């Protein structure tokens, strides 16, 4: 039976809002990832059957099928096709699923799954207009931050709990950066600056000097009177790209390329679009069932820290060993470049599994309007 295996996984560092990547076109953030995936694996780009790209705000510089634009900018043969997809925050995780499914179906031997978002240049929501009247008649659609507040209220989560999770995210991220834990997964890229070019290789969002006092001083972003969700316990506006090279196990053996992991289960769920962000709970249960595993068997977990309340509600329901969860920090510290985040987290998950000699890794991500994606990989 055909298996979809991960041969390589890399990402750029995550740029902060209007930071190092502000002058870099999103295509030029993704193209180096594509080049490096084929160059360092020794794969001939001609053999890539398809490139699947996740991107959320597909307008302006990110419109026009950005995946195809990046393939051409990377110098791939024109015969290499690409398409772009939007499952909101789960976009590049869905790209991984689609790329794997194409291999499992026998339609491809080699695929690339990737994602990109330059939120500094293409603002979140700039691709949206008004909601349909039939939609709003059925559902009281609210901004995600209000959903995060609803989650905090439903699970009786205190401001202190959310800020503690945020502080720990920054602490873990800083420690991991200092220990060189991200060096294998981050591809340094040259970026345009006013005085020429600079090499960008470090995540910009880590706040080493934050504290509970500093976090407590922030005004709630969505409910100023009594709310608990702040900029400090929410993910950051970020820029970046990430990508994975996938093959059938047979093709990897034929090319003499060592597979690093195999994708053993994939899941996507729908959930209440008003509460919106709680799909991570049923998605985790669904993907574990598909894999025939329980949470105790998972060695490393990446859950997107869109909001601290999402992670805390998930923790309350599933009771995971939190030392395994976002062990190198999460999106509160490391950023959430929307369409790139799924591939970014899978990249971190794979490297974490390798570094700790773990076997199974779980990735799960909440998605706007009430969805979630989940993936389980097995290190080989």
Which residue stretches match the model-derived regions?
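Conserved beta-ketoacyl condensing-enzyme motif
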Residues: 22-111, 116-132, 186-201, 274, ...
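N-terminal extracellular/periplasmic Venus flytrap/periplasmic-binding protein-like
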Residues: 10-12, 22-23, 29-32, 40, ...
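Active-site pocket-lining segment
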Residues: 185, 193, 264-333
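Active-site-proximal alpha-helical scaffold in enzymes
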Residues: 87-116, 152-182, 243-250, 337-358, ...
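Short, well-ordered amphipathic alpha-helical segments that serve as non-catalytic structural scaffolds
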Residues: 26-41, 66-70, 95, 144-151, ...
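Condensing-enzyme catalytic core mediating Claisen C-C bond formation in acyl metabolism
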Residues: 1-24, 212-278, 282, 289, ...
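Conserved catalytic cysteine-centered active-site region
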Residues: 55-108, 139-146, 209-236, 317-344, ...
